[in-house]
Structures are given as C-alpha cells and as structure tokens.
Amino acid sequence: MSDEGSKRGSRADSLEAEPPLPPPPPPPPPGESSLVPTSPRYRPPLPAPLERIVGSGEPPVELAPRRKGEPLPPLPPSRLPGDQEVSAAGDSCEGPRRLPEVKLPEAAAGKGSPAEPEAGACREGERRGTGDQPETRSVYSSRSSSSGGSGDQRSGHQHQHHQPICKICFQGAEQGELLNPCRCDGSVRYTHQLCLLKWISERGSWTCELCCYRYHVTAIKMKQPCQWQSISITLVEKVQMIAVILGSLFLIASVTWLLWSAFSPYAVWQRKDILFQICYGMYGFMDLVCIGLIVHEGAAVYRVFKRWRAVNLHWDVLNYDKATDIEESSRGESSTSRTLWLPLSALRNRNLVHPTQLTSPRFQCGYVLLHLFNRMRAHEDVSEDNGSGEVVMRVTSV
C-alpha cells in the first residue's frame, strides 16, 4: 500500500510540473479559409532559374539543397505585400488567394522562406502548363511541314520520271542537249552526245547494244595534239606496225641508192664493177619483198590508224530518222557502208565467208566433196552403233 501511494504521489507531482497545453487556435472567420496548416508542409524546390524564384528587383540567392536526414527548417514568416497574390497549397496552383499574416519566432526569420520556392515552383508549373500548347503546335506544324515536304518530294519524283533523262548518266536536259540516236523508245530513248561518244569509245562499236542500230555520225574536226589519246593494240598489231615501218624505211633508202647509182656521173665505176651489179640485184629483190610486206600488213595498220583517228576526232551524232531508216531497209542498203570505225572482231568476222554463201565453182566443188565424205562416214558410224543396239546422233559442222 505504501508503494502504490508513493507511485501515485510521484505521478501527480510530474503532472503538476508539466506546463499546460496551449488552447487550440480559434476557427477562422466565415469569409476566409484556413490556408496555413497546423503542420506546415515543405517540399524541396524544383531546380528553376534564379530569375523565376527571386523577383526582378531582388538579387539572386542560391538555395542550398537539403541533405538526407537533415530536419526540415521551420516555417518563416510570410510577410508578403498586400497586393501580392500567391496560389494556395503550392501544388494545387488554383486561383489567386491571399495568405493570412502569421507571426513566427524571429529565430526562423533569417533562414529564408520556403513559401517563395513554392510560389516559384507554382509559377514555373504555370509557365510549363502554358508552354505546352505552343510546343504541341510546333510539333504539329513540324509534322505537317514534313508531310508537306514528303508530298512535294513525291510529286518532284513523279515529275522527274515524266521528264526525259539520259540512259547513260541518268541526268536531264540541264547537263546538255538530249538526242534520240537510235530506235530505242521509252526510258532508254534519249542520251547526251558526250555520254554516247564516251560510251562508244569504251565499248568499241558504233552500234546500239539494245536495238542493234548503227548510229549516224559525222566527223567535225581533229582534236588538238595535247588532247590526243592512245588506244590499246595487241602484240600482233605491234609487230605488224614495226614491220611496215622498217620495210618502208628500207625501201626508201634502197630505192634512193639505186637511183643515184644508175643516173649519177660519179657512179660510173660502180656500174662497171661486177660486185656492185650483184648488189643491185639483191637490193632490187629486197625492195620487192618490202613492197609485198607493206601491201600485206598495210590493211591491219590502216585499221589501227582508223581506230586512233576515231578516238581523236570530234564527232557529231545525228538524231534517228525513221523515214531514212525505212528507206534504207527497203533498198537493202548495208549499214556497214556508213560505218567509220568498227572493232577488230567485227572487221575480221566481216572478211570471213560463210559456207552457205560460197558462189565460186571451185568452192562449190570442194563443199560438195566434203559433204559426201561426211555422209559416208555418218553411215559407217550408224551401222556400227546399230550393231551394239545404241543410237548415236552426231552433228558435224563444215
């Protein structure tokens, strides 16, 4: 009993020692709403520019970020001017309302008010909210402009497809005049003159590779010596050219010496000497050999010269004339008559004679004999194959 009485006495003493609790604040008048909460909420300010947080007339003040575990600073006095309006509850950003003046201890007045960051954050949110609409408009305008640009690009491509272009460089008329040199039609109808001449020099033929039409060209003039280009020649052509050049030099020298020995008064003793008479005969025979060599190899050298001339001449390609083409085809005129230069393979193949086009009686007799021998050999092979029970067909070309 004494213990319980002592405990009750100590509890009563402690209750008397504690100060009394302050009375609750009076309710606000009906015209004003209680905007300041009993436990003030403090949110860390957003990283906004200093101009937005601080007024235009005050110097910028840097706000130190709150560290983790640090207690919240006390609420500073909200000493705002009478005409300044802020939004209630910093995160609601509703219509402008006035805050009632609340007096707080002076110790917390020097630490800065967190209401200003909240007001700045609210203004920043309002500015962001108001800035969303122009941004959306700009995005929409950029999309519309991009769609319009793509539409213009498509229309430009379609317009470009309708325009005639060169079938070699795929460029339009801005790179030069477009010609129609052959029977080709459609997208491969036109070409530039320079592109066609370069393609002819690279390909080595005056014939279109698509319609096999031989171009109508005319030579204008020779290029300048500084613009001359070399052509590719084979080893056989080099030997032929060297043989023709050396034979020509020997022929000129020997004929000059023979004429001087025959008509000069200073060569009377040479004409009477037997050794010089033998030399005259040998030189005459060598001159005949050189003449035959020049005649035999002169055609090949002349073809090489025509190729070189074709590369180093300025040519003019004419447009295709359908009436002229029909007239030439009706007359049966060969297109090789107007060919200025052909590749070596075409020139060599043109000189060959097909066995079905032999018109000489001598060639006809030889062809008949070869045909008879081949038929006899075919009969022997067939009889041997029939004995083995197998049928073999052999085709022999003559």
Swiss-Prot record:
One Pfam family matching this protein: RINGv
EC number assigned by the record: 2.3.2.27
Positions bound to Zn(2+) 2: C182, C184, C208, C211
Transmembrane segments: 241-261, 274-294
Residues in RING-CH-type zinc fingers: 158-218
Membrane topology, record value: Multi-pass membrane protein
Reactions performed catalytically: S-ubiquitinyl-[E2 ubiquitin-conjugating enzyme]-L-cysteine + [acceptor protein]-L-lysine = [E2 ubiquitin-conjugating enzyme]-L-cysteine + N(6)-ubiquitinyl-[acceptor protein]-L-lysine
Annotated stretches, region: Disordered: 1-158
Known outcome of mutating C184S: Abolishes ubiquitin ligase activity
Sequence motif PDZ-binding, residues: 395-398
Coiled-coil parts of chain: none
Principal location listed in the UniProt entry: membrane
InterPro entries given in the database record: MARCHF11_RING_CH-C4HC3, MARCHF4/9/11, Znf_RING-CH, Znf_RING/FYVE/PHD
Example GO BP: protein ubiquitination
GO molecular function, one term: ubiquitin-protein transferase activity
Binding site for Zn(2+) 1: C166, C169, H192, C195
Subcellular location: Cytoplasmic vesicle membrane
Effect of substituting C182S: Abolishes ubiquitin ligase activity
Protein purpose: E3 ubiquitin-protein ligase that mediates polyubiquitination of CD4. E3 ubiquitin ligases accept ubiquitin from an E2 ubiquitin-conjugating enzyme in the form of a thioester and then directly transfer the ubiquitin to targeted substrates. May play a role in ubuquitin-dependent protein sorting in developmenting spermatids.
Subunit and partners: Interacts (YXXL motif) with AP1M1. Interacts (via PDZ-binding motif) with LIN7A. Interacts with unidentified fucose glycoproteins.
Name assigned to this protein: E3 ubiquitin-protein ligase MARCHF11
